[in-house]
Amino acid sequence: MRVKNYREIRDEPVVEEPGLTVRWLVSDLEEQPEFAMRLYELQPGAATTPHVHGWEHQVFVLAGQGVVIGGEDECLLGEGDVVYISPLERHQFVNAGEEVLRFLMVFPIPRGDAYTETHNKTQ
């Protein structure tokens, strides 16, 4: 068992995603867990680049307001909302509010080239 406070984990800017920071709460650097957990903070007016992954992930919105765009669908997001994104589903997060959009993301840790490419975007 491990317990830590998220404030003790450094937030890092995500390369190529202005206005987005990440805290690696649980990662593959810790005894090879099967799932990772990240805390993202997206600044007002900022958006992630539309992208896809070969793995599913779940998102829990902690604070703020935004929009998640998946394919042809757009859904408003707010505190307490949960999002499931299927493998290979194109998606994007947009902060449509006046405060930071803060959300947790949990996903299986992909192995191999796909993971290396995604992981390096935050270095």
Residue ranges and their predicted role:
Residues R38-H53:
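Conserved short histidine dyad/triad with adjacent acidic residue
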Residues L39, Y84, E99-A114:
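A short hydrophobic beta-strand segment most commonly corresponding to one strand
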Residues T48-P50, V68-I69, I85, H91-G97:
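Short beta-strand His + acidic residue motifs that chelate non-heme Fe in jelly-roll/DSBH
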